[in-house]
């Protein structure tokens, strides 16, 4: 277990023998770090926090610190990070709160670029990319394979659907539909299916075409959401992707970006 002599590690921390703790890192009590995970330097981790295997965490990242929530009064909440994530410089990841299940979670194989912020009770899936300066407010849920462009802000309690792409500098205050591409400055607009991303992930071209047609009905046909759903159910084959899209929309509490 290579731990740099300048690192400070609480005796209760559970660190795998193959993990690497770099210079000037601080590892607090009740922290677990899995095999082959590396903390480069100046990384600060508070517990209760679990970090899985083969993660790389870059300098000046903070993990598991208290949330920026005035209702938080020191309750025992935790942070869970999966495996094979790359967490770049100055990323901030906050623990959960009583209002959100007491846990913040990050899945596997994500890339969190510099200065990204993961607030309390966020649930980030797997294979996601958060570009520089992305800010996820409390209770945000990000589906697998989502890509969020630089300096985008996501309002609390919003959901970003799986396989979606959000353009840089966007301000997202409603749910973003799965499989879609959304770009905004202040007024958000959906520009259709995330065709390029779906092709790269091996989706069938016919399935992508059905998604494109469904999103066109939702965003460009001058229909309200209920009318668009009726048209989709009547006119477009009920593929698994279409079922996921409709289930996401029908479960939205904030409305969806159109």
Segments and roles (model prediction):
Residues 2-187:
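Structural signal for interior beta-strand "rungs" in well-ordered beta-sheet cores
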């Amino acid at each position: 277990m290579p731990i740099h002599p300048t690192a400070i590690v609480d005796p209760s921390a559970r660190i795998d023998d193959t993990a690497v703790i770099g210079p000037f890192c601080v590892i607090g009590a009740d922290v677990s770090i899995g095999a082959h995970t590396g903390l480069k330097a100046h990384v600060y981790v508070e517990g209760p926090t679990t970090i899985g295997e083969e993660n790389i965490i870059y300098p000046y990242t903070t993990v598991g610190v208290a949330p920026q929530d005035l209702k938080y009064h020191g309750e025992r909440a935790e942070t869970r990070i999966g495996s094979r994530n790359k967490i770049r410089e100055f990323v901030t990841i906050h623990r959960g709160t009583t209002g959100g299940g007491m846990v913040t979670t990050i899945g596997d194989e994500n890339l969190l670029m510099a200065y990204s912020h993961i607030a309390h009770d966020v649930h980030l899936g797997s294979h996601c990319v958060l570009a520089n300066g992305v800010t996820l407010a409390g209770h945000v849920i990000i589906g697998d394979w989502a890509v969020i462009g630089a300096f985008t802000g996501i309002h609390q309690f919003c959901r970003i659907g799986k396989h979606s792409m959000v353009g840089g500098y966007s301000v997202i205050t409603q749910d973003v539909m799965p499989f879609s591409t959304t770009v905004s400055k202040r007024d958000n607009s959906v520009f259709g299916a995330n065709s390029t991303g779906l092709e790269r992930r091996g989706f069938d071209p016919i399935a992508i075409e059905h998604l494109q047609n469904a999103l066109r009905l939702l965003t460009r046909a001058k229909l309200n959401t209920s009318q668009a759903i009726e048209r989709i159910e009547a006119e477009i084959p009920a593929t698994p992707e279409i079922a996921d899209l409709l289930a996401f929309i029908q479960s939205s509490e904030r409305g969806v970006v159109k």
